[in-house]
């Protein structure tokens, strides 16, 4: 039976990769809805190729522009806009599968709507679990939704776990691998000089600018630790991070009998996307087979928290529980945005996040409203902290110890 997809964030890198896989298997997948924020021209191209019933954009002006271009081309796709429109296409009866690929907190509401509607959810938006882990997982369970991880690391773990996962014993720990990003071997004292363009040059993966910066700070890996906690029901002390510069082993599961199962493959997001789209089947992803003879070596090392203080902050937020992870994510989004705008230096990202976590009281999350309030408070606190940084100090902050 053909799956009908809503693709949240279709114009981003995950969206591109998803549509590449979809195009290879028209008998298996069709597109019900595509969504973008402001990249109207690219969305028009996608609509003309995949002919979705609905397309969603961020604002009225972009909607009018996209609608006019589609009418001129004879495309009948309906154009809507705004946050509620994202929620509507995520819970619509027109789709059975939602690919959640919107970056950041903006993806929480539509992802949660898909869970409450009992959809099959391919989760690439890790912030949904980072911000509202218990609330999100309860919605998945209570409404019969199916949650399949698309992040390469979590998809790798999913492939290495028995279907009953860690709840039934036998799993000692899971091991998330990380490339270490572009600054793995750079002298820590020089990281204050890093530019946005340097931070966005990932050695192995092709990603958007925000997630590229998160990879460079290793905040991305920290968020993945939190995500893994919720996905696989494991405490933080049973989730290990290892730097693996080759990005060939995407993650591992260690078992009580001494076995370690690993998932290997070329670093291309189409592999985990194809796995999740077709699960439990396997389909061609378009990714070349891994040639083990060409893999010169596989190396591993422990992450350096002095070089990567954001990873330490994320692990700390998970241990604290409550709304700490939501505050961490919000502060990081504001700090990364400021860094990309050249308002603060690279190492100030961790300083901003640390300051926000120390300034805001932590409390339990009982409802989505609690998460939204914590997110807003952390964003305000981060912006205020950035505004107070002296101009001359913004690029010379020391790392959080």
UniProtKB/Swiss-Prot annotation:
Belongs to the DXR family. PANTHER family: 1-DEOXY-D-XYLULOSE 5-PHOSPHATE REDUCTOISOMERASE (PTHR30525), 1-DEOXY-D-XYLULOSE 5-PHOSPHATE REDUCTOISOMERASE, CHLOROPLASTIC (PTHR30525:SF0). Keywords: Isoprene biosynthesis, Manganese, Metal-binding, NADP, Oxidoreductase. GO terms for molecular function: 1-deoxy-D-xylulose-5-phosphate reductoisomerase activity; manganese ion binding; NADPH binding. Its cofactor is Mg(2+); Mn(2+). Catalyzes the NADPH-dependent rearrangement and reduction of 1-deoxy-D-xylulose-5-phosphate (DXP) to 2-C-methyl-D-erythritol 4-phosphate (MEP). Its EC number is 1.1.1.267. NADPH binds at residues 11-14, 38-39, 125, 127, 208. This is 1-deoxy-D-xylulose 5-phosphate reductoisomerase. Mn(2+) binds at residues 151, 153, 224. InterPro entries: DXP_reductoisomerase, DXP_reductoisomerase_C, DXP_reductoisomerase_N, DXPR_C, DXPR_C_sf, NAD(P)-bd_dom_sf. 1-deoxy-D-xylulose 5-phosphate binds at residues 126, 152-153, 179, 202, 215, 220-221, 224. GO terms for biological process: isopentenyl diphosphate biosynthetic process, methylerythritol 4-phosphate pathway involved in terpenoid biosynthetic process. Pathway: Isoprenoid biosynthesis; isopentenyl diphosphate biosynthesis via DXP pathway; isopentenyl diphosphate from 1-deoxy-D-xylulose 5-phosphate: step 1/6. SUPFAM superfamilies: 1-deoxy-D-xylulose-5-phosphate reductoisomerase, C-terminal domain, Glyceraldehyde-3-phosphate dehydrogenase-like, C-terminal domain, NAD(P)-binding Rossmann-fold domains. It catalyses: 2-C-methyl-D-erythritol 4-phosphate + NADP(+) = 1-deoxy-D-xylulose 5-phosphate + NADPH + H(+).
């Amino acid at each position: 039976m053909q799956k009908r997809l809503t693709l949240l964030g279709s114009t981003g890198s995950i969206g591109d990769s998803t549509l590449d896989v979809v195009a290879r298997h028209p008998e298996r997948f069709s597109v019900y809805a595509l969504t973008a924020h402001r990249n109207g021209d690219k969305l028009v191209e996608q609509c003309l190729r995949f002919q979705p019933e609905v397309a969603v954009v961020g604002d009225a002006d972009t909607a009018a522009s996209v609608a006019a271009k589609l009418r001129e081309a004879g495309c009948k796709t309906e154009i809507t806009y705004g946050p509620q429109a994202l929620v509507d296409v995520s819970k619509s009866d027109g789709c059975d599968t939602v690919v959640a690929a919107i970056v950041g907190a903006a993806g929480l509401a539509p992802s949660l709507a898909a869970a409450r509607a009992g959809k099959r959810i391919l989760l690439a938006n890790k912030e949904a679990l980072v911000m509202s882990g218990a609330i999100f997982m309860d919605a998945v369970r209570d409404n019969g939704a199916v949650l399949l991880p698309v992040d390469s690391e979590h998809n790798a773990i999913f492939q290495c776990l028995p279907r009953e996962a860690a709840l039934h014993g036998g799993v000692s720990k899971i091991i998330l691998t990380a490339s270490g990003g572009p600054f793995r071997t750079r002298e820590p004292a020089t990281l204050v000089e890093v530019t946005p363009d340097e931070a966005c040059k990932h050695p192995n993966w092709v990603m958007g600018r925000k997630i590229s910066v998160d990879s460079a700070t290793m905040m991305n890996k920290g968020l993945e630790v939190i995500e893994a906690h919720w996905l696989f029901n494991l405490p933080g002390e049973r989730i290990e991070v290892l730097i693996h510069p080759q990005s060939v082993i995407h993650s591992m599961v260690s078992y009580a009998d001494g076995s370690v199962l690993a998932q290997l493959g070329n670093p291309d997001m189409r592999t985990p996307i194809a796995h999740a789209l077709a699960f439990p089947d396997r389909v061609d992803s378009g990714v070349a087979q891994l040639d083990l003879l060409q893999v010169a070596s596989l190396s591993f090392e422990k992450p350096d928290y002095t070089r990567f203080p954001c990873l330490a902050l994320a692990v700390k937020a998970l241990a604290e529980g409550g709304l700490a992870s939501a505050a961490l994510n919000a502060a990081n989004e504001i700090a990364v945005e400021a860094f990309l705008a050249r308002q603060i230096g690279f190492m100030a990202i961790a300083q901003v996040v640390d300051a926000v976590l120390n300034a805001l009281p932590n409390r339990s999350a009982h409802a989505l409203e609690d998460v939204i309030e914590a997110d807003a408070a952390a964003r305000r606190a981060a912006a205020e902290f950035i505004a107070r940084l002296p101009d001359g100090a913004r690029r010379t902050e020391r790392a959080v110890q």
